[in-house]
Amino acid sequence: EMSASLVGSEMCIRDSLTMHDFYMIDAKVEEVARALGLSELGLDKDVTELSGGQRTKVLLGKLLLEKPDILLLDEPTNYLDKEHIEWLKRYLQDYENAFILISHDIPFLNSVINVIYHMDNQELNRYTGDYDNFQKVYAVKKAQLEAAYNKQQQEIAELKDFVARNKARVATRNMAMSRQKKLDNMDIIELAAEKPKPEFNFKTARTPGRYIFQTHDLVIGYDEPLSSPLNLEMERGQKIVLTGANGIGKSTLLKSILGLIKPLSGDVEQGDYLEIGYFEQETPAGIETTCLEEIWQEFPGYTQYEVRSALAKCGLTTKHIESKVKVLSGGEQAKVRLCKLINRESNILVLDEPTNHLDVDAKDELKRALMAYKGSILMVCHEPEFYDGLATDVWDCGKWTTRI
């Protein structure tokens, strides 16, 4: 009897191991690492040596290899390049178990989901279909609710008017009381307050010289070179996008051009009369200030009203404005950093993955603002749908890197 029990337990363990690909785990690790662009880094590399985007890929790969019953994915396409997003798309389309996904990448959403849960006015509502279908159904539902609200408001006004005119007269008092009772028992329709939409309008400084920067045999990196010698130049009016896989040195190139880190060799010659606006990929760690204090420190001449107004224009609510920066979501923190940029004159914007974490409305408004911007732009971005129609030039950093 004990032997049969042990055999049964062994079979359960074997089935579980088989289900989780235990007997082909090495091949699975290689497959996921290759698909997420981790193989070229070396799988024996210390995680502490990786960039933020590379670490995110490692965590995502680890999670996918675990094959849980339910996958919880919070903005999984942030830091992923186009080919890696395509692979993740196919993976989720074939995924046998359930997954719950938060994402602002609409093409990605549409390709992998069949149910939307929408948080609206403190209610969670379920919609069947993809995001495009949800938008259509939600628009119809919203229009119907607004029509019902307007009809009810008209009825309420008429009832109140009748009660006011007839409650004092003996002949009509009972009718007035009946109308009042109807008013008291009415289920009032409430419309959700409109979510504040951001407005980004960049201030342009004086016109700079012809060249924004020129590099002369520039080799970027820290301990080891990340690039071959670079001879690049950017002219006034160009809007250049840097593309390429994570960890090949795109952010390092921006910081080298700005003079924030020293190159390993060569030099950068900045142009004349530059007024630079720099957007970092992430909020620096250790910030203890509120949003209000953060902007006030940057613009001490502003009144409190002006600081609040500046933050509100970026789509932040009173609650956000009075909260510490460190407790905000990635998208809200990005809006605080954008607030600093749009309130200072510039003639060159240097943007490191500005769309990471931003919601659809903020992303659309940012693209509009950048297209309207009269200055020059140097931007790292992994979303072609964002920079299409905006960029005058696209530079593939994979052609220069020593990491591939």
Locate predicted features.
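ABC ATP-binding cassette signature C-motif
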Residues: 9-10, 14-147, 196, 205-404
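Post-kinase regulatory C-tail/linker adjacent to protein kinase catalytic domains
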Residues: 200-202
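Single conserved hydrophobic/aromatic residue that forms the stacking wall/gate
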Residues: 1-8
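Intracellular alpha-helical coupling/juxtamembrane segments of multi-pass membrane proteins
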Residues: 137-187
